[in-house]
């Protein structure tokens, strides 16, 4: 007697001859792949769960259980498709003016709706506390999309307005220090900028009234140290909104700590 095939499951064979079972489902005219599995029984379970999710409003984003067979990412995709009528292959759920990107049960990130196209085609990965995407073959921290440097420290270089480190909507992120070696601080009620450069230990280059001056001071300090024989690949600051002549004028007039001129390779 011929064994009955499982609904929504298709048997295939991999290049090495290993059997594989693909599960898929069609909903609202959309054919959705649910994944490939090594056992037909597992693929059948995934199809059944997908069918229930799509045809029952009793399932919500918080309904996922560890003993479910369907992968969590696919679970989110189906909930969003059922509720919003838009299928997105990444685990995204659309809200009115923003969307959430779900990394695991109970952990999701918020983004502005204008970032939907990017995150629909770029998968977010998590390693420890580091969140990144694969972009053109390299790992790109999601903070870099806001102009936040890889060495930036939360609370010192940037902060979240509502104290929620999972809320990446633009209005919630304030960048305090955009440039390498520059730190913002308050002095007598005024915002100032301190420039620090590291050669074995930290050297204070100076304190400045503007962020641009502080950034250029870092570059000037690096030039002095390199001229003194310090062999280090200093990460220079690119200062926006300044013409070459404006940059040169500020560079020449800026005062830096005299100590920098005494730092030599044999003393560093």
Regions found by a protein language model. Give the residues of each.
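Boundary-flanking segments of nucleic-acid-binding domains in nuclear regulatory proteins
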Residues: 1-268
């Amino acid at each position: 007697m011929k064994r009955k095939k499982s609904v929504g499951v298709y048997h295939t064979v991999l290049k090495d001859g290993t059997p594989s079972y693909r599960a898929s489902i069609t909903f609202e005219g959309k054919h959705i792949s649910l994944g490939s599995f090594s056992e037909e029984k597992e693929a059948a379970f995934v199809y059944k769960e997908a069918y229930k999710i799509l045809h029952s409003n009793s399932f919500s984003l918080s309904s996922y259980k560890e003993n479910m067979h369907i992968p969590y990412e696919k679970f989110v995709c189906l909930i969003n498709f059922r509720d919003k009528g838009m299928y997105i292959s990444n685990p995204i759920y659309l809200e009115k003016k923003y969307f959430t990107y779900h990394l695991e049960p109970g952990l999701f990130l918020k983004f502005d709706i204008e970032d939907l196209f990017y995150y629909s085609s770029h998968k977010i990965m998590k390693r420890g506390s580091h969140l990144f995407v694969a972009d053109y073959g390299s790992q790109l921290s999601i903070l870099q999309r806001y102009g936040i440097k890889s060495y930036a420290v939360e609370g010192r270089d940037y902060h979240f307005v509502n104290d929620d480190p999972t809320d990446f909507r633009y209005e919630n992120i304030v960048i305090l220090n955009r440039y390498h070696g520059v730190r913002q601080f308050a002095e007598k009620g005024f915002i100032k900028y301190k420039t620090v450069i590291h050669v074995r230990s930290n050297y204070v280059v100076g304190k400045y009234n503007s962020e641009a001056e502080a950034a250029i001071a870092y570059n000037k300090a690096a030039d002095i140290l390199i001229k003194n024989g310090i062999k280090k690949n200093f990460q220079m600051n690119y200062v926006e909104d300044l013409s070459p002549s404006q940059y040169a004028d500020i560079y020449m007039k800026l005062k830096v700590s005299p100590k920098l001129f005494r730092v030599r390779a044999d003393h560093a």
